[in-house]
Regions:
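Flexible inter-repeat linkers and adjacent short helices
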Residues: 1-140, 148
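Structural detector for internal amphipathic alpha-helices that build alpha-solenoid repeat scaffolds
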Residues: 12-26, 48-57, 80-91, 112-124, ...
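Amphipathic alpha-helical scaffolding segments comprising HEAT/armadillo-like alpha-solenoid repeats
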Residues: 28-37, 59-71, 91-105, 127-136, ...
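Short inter-helical turns and helix N-cap capping residues of alpha-solenoid HEAT/ARM repeat scaffolds
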Residues: 42-43, 73-74, 140-142, 171-172, ...
């Protein structure tokens, strides 16, 4: 019996054994998009492992995801994201990335959990690119130049005189309001009247018209001139102002026939 068991044991030992199974590491087969999506996982540990796995990745698609993780509710994840951005700041493309993702950088400051030293690094990098600041404020429209102008004023990234020059000619109406507010508070009535009559922007004409009308600066000749504005809202305001002064429209049109006004 013992001899039979020994023979069976020898036979079993001669059967080829399968190779030990290698534990699959899920990160190996995941694309960058999938890994970036994992950074939004509900599991804080999963986010941590993903950040650790991506620590040497400098693909541009990852940058905004790291900005978002600066406010991660798990402290180690905030630290990992901050360390990654700190390393990235030594690379030549970092400045352009900060510019491209400025709105996300601004959003970081509005969150409860932040990493102040990295926020300062990001903002200082944007501030150093004065050509970008000036071009964006003067030539673009929408949320980006509006938010950027707030930061420029708050942190004095551009000298006030230069910013006034840029905002006066800015394409975005909200950015122009910085210049408008400044001149209505600081310039003379004569200067405001000059800007009113020479501005090519509807919002500037209307706002300055309203300011000067409320201050009782405009005479009937000024209002008549504005009545011929190419902007309907300004024309309508001027018509209202003339009616308030009991302007004799009949006599005016007798002296200035509509055909003559149209040709002019």
């Amino acid at each position: 019996m013992a001899e039979r068991q020994a023979l069976e044991q020898i036979h079993i030992s001669n059967i080829p054994q399968p190779e030990p199974e290698i534990v699959d590491i899920p990160f190996i087969r995941k694309s960058l998009d999938e890994l970036i999506w994992l950074l939004r996982d509900y599991d804080g540990y999963a986010r941590q492992r993903t950040l650790e796995h991506l620590k040497d990745c400098y693909e541009q698609e990852l940058f905004p995801a790291l900005l978002f993780r600066l406010s991660d509710y798990v402290e180690i994840n905030r630290e990992l994201a901050a360390q990654h951005i700190q390393r990235w700041s030594q690379r030549p493309e970092f400045a352009q990335l900060c510019i491209d993702h400025f709105l996300q950088i601004a959003a970081v400051q509005q969150r409860v959990r932040t990493v102040p030293e990295i926020e300062n690094l990001l903002l200082n990098t944007v501030a150093e690119n004065t050509d970008y600041l000036q071009h964006t404020v003067s030539s673009e429209q929408g949320q980006l130049p509006r938010v950027l102008s707030i930061y420029i004023v708050k942190y004095q990234w551009i000298e006030q005189e230069k910013l006034l020059e840029l905002s006066k000619a800015a394409k975005d109406q909200i950015v122009r309001k910085f210049w408008l507010d400044h001149i209505t508070q600081n310039e003379s009535a004569q200067k405001l009247l000059f800007e009113l009559k020479h501005s090519q922007f509807r919002d500037v004409q209307y706002h300055l018209f309203d300011v000067l009308y409320q201050r009782k600066i405009l005479n009937p000749e000024d209002i008549i001139e504005l009545w011929h504005s190419r902007f309907l809202s300004v024309m309508d305001y001027a018509y209202f102002a003339l009616r308030q002064q009991n302007f004799d429209f009949g006599n005016y049109f007798n002296q200035h026939p509509i055909a003559l006004l149209s040709s002019q």
